[in-house]
């Protein structure tokens, strides 16, 4: 285990999960069956972090200590073995077979699951209709989910599951255009309900905090501060700060990472801002391979991002955005958040005791607007008749739980 965790820290991959392990000061072993983690500061959420893939146990022989493993093969201690099928340097199918050496607590209800990867949601939906696959999830478009809800297809069931994914706008807070008053004015104008309803239908709902409503500690911090969308109030914010209008900048989004509705969402945001007369915003989409490095480099004044939590705790919706080594590489700093409230919240073993700290953190975000929450999503799984365990097949943090799937009548 020491090797597995230490290598994640040492490799420090730019897009990796090292942030979850940033509080580790030292790792030592005691005998053959004990690992001791020394933390820099107290952290009641650390056991949750050890339960994520960031701390997954991998064999030394296949996983070098200072470098990522090459290729697509994966070895570990989980409930399945994995065999990828590769075409033109890209994985197109993965076969998961029950691991005879697995010693964990999960009850695996199937012997094998095959996963096909599709270029888009249309191709995936077509494969389900043609009975080439038995189940689809994650990248299902709002249109597909709505169609299945309104006009159910024979032989296909649609299951709604709790979702903890969020969508938000991020800002380079050092950019001279998107100053705090400008960000506050955007928060005052944007109509989240219209965006969620018009673009995503039943698959999303408005979000007024970084912490979604289904997580303990949530408050409607943005609604409490700004209320209903108001161009008049936004104009007062800008006028008081001496900001010349219309404010001009480009709002960036990734065209291929979060699903087909992203472009429509950002067109709706653009229309709302520009219709106020206070903004003249253009939008631009980039492929994720270009988008993410440019966003982290600070090339974008304003941009859209999504977040799938690593574990269902308010810490995972605040620290990754507000800590020094934050996920966005944002220049925004709040000393109160970073030095006082986040450490205070992590000291509370009883997570309900951290509610006051999280309320203050959400209020800081609503006031400074380093990020601007837009919506929180629901999860849907479409499956063909005869597949059981679908309601448990995807966790609240959007992780596949393939071991729950089975065919009782097969």
Question: Language-model segments: what does each one mean?
Answer:
Residues 206-241, 257-264:
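Structural transition elements
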């Amino acid at each position: 285990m020491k090797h597995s965790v230490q290598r994640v820290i040492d490799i420090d991959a730019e897009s990796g999960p090292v942030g979850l392990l940033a509080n580790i000061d030292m790792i030592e072993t005691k005998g053959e069956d004990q690992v001791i983690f020394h933390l820099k500061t107290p952290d009641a959420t650390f056991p949750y972090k050890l339960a994520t893939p960031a701390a997954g146990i991998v064999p030394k022989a296949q996983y070098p200590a200072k470098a990522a493993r090459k290729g697509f093969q994966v070895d570990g201690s989980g409930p399945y073995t994995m065999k990828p099928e590769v075409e033109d340097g890209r994985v197109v199918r993965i076969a998961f077979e029950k691991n005879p050496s697995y010693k964990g607590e999960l009850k695996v209800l199937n012997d094998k699951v095959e996963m096909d990867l599709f270029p888009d949601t249309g191709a995936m939906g077509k494969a389900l209709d043609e009975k080439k696959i038995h189940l689809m999830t994650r990248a299902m478009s709002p249109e597909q989910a709505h169609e299945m809800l309104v006009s159910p297809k024979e032989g296909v069931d649609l299951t709604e599951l709790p979702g903890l994914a969020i969508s938000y706008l991020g800002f380079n807070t050092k950019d001279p255009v998107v100053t705090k008053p400008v960000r506050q004015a955007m928060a005052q104008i944007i109509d989240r309900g219209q965006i969620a309803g018009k673009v995503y239908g039943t698959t999303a709902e408005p979000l007024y905090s970084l912490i979604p409503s289904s997580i303990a500690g949530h408050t409607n911090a943005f609604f409490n501060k700004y209320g209903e969308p108001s161009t008049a109030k936004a104009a007062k914010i800008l006028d008081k700060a001496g900001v010349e209008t219309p404010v001009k900048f480009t709002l960036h989004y990734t065209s291929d990472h979060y699903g087909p509705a992203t472009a429509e969402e950002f067109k709706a945001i653009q229309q709302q801002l520009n219709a106020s007369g206070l903004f003249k915003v253009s939008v631009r989409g980039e492929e994720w391979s270009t988008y993410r490095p440019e966003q982290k480099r600070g090339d974008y004044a304003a941009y859209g991002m999504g977040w799938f939590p690593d574990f269902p705790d308010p810490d995972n919706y605040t620290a990754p955005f507000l800590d020094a080594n934050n996920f966005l590489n944002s220049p925004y700093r709040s000393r109160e958040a970073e030095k006082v409230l986040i450490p205070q919240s992590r000291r509370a073993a009883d997570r309900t005791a951290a509610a006051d700290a999280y309320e203050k953190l959400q209020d800081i975000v609503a006031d400074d607007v380093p990020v601007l929450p837009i919506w929180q999503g629901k999860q849907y799984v479409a499956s063909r008749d005869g597949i059981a365990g679908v309601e448990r097949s995807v966790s609240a943090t959007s992780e596949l739980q393939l071991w729950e799937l089975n065919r009782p009548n097969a």
